[in-house]
Amino acid sequence: MRERAVGGALASTVEITSASVQRGDLIQVGGQPCRVVDLFQLAHGAKRLVFDSGELLTMHARTRLVAMRMLRRW
């Protein structure tokens, strides 16, 4: 699904795992949108996500989430 975001950028919903999560992904947690600003590699394929609010979320290797991702076009 693609839709126009603020400023005319294209946004798409994507399924993410600890292997595919990126900085800038927008993940809805508990009904609140959280933007990933940093991430750290952990043991066994897990990653610790840091959101713009300062909150943390650990994604294990088998965790699957849906995120909104801005598509970059150059």
Identify the role of each PLM range.
Residues 44-53:
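Short, solvent-exposed secondary-structure boundary/capping segments
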Residues 2-11, 56-74:
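Intrinsically disordered, low-complexity, charged/polar segments
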Residues 20-21:
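Short, well-ordered loop/turn sites that connect or cap secondary structure elements
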Residues 32-33, 53-55:
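Short acidic/polar mixed-charge low-complexity motifs
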Residues 32-42:
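Short beta-strand-centered aromatic/proline hotspots
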